[in-house]
């Protein structure tokens, strides 16, 4: 018997779509009236922060855990990094961060305007690192979040 598996959407694309689809006028006005560039890291290439704020997403790890004996569930988790950067100010960085956090919390509680892609069961925040460089006026937070899907193993 051949096992069949569902093709899941790329977890990075799912996180980018979640943030992009829920970034509305409230967040845009909180960060000075300009929506940041939100995309997958490999699609953005090099960008100058002086031209606008950037939110890059990329996957740093993934894993599978078979739940049960024999036929069961494959719990797939991916750790996605959300890299938030601005050259404006620390308060602008905090506003961008608050927007991203609010969207992820809303998705986790299933109250986001646009839901997390249906391939994935949940998204949760893991950590935040401040990687700002005050000498260069480059303000940056790096967030890690975990996105989880479940798949039946035949």
What are these regions (language model features)?
Residues 53-56, 80, 123, 143:
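A broad, low-specificity signal marking well-ordered, structured residues that form hydrophobic/aromatic
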Residues 101-154:
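Acidic-leaning, charged glycine-interspersed low-complexity segments
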Residues 1-70, 107-113:
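Small/polar-rich, solvent-exposed N-terminal microdomains that initiate assembly or binding
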Residues 71-73, 95-101:
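"Short basic amphipathic alpha-helical interaction patches in structured regions
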Residues 89-95:
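Short, conserved charged micro-motifs
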Residues 72-89, 139-150:
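Oligomerization/assembly interface segments of phage tail-like spikes and tubes
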Residues 7, 11, 92, 137:
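Conserved acidic
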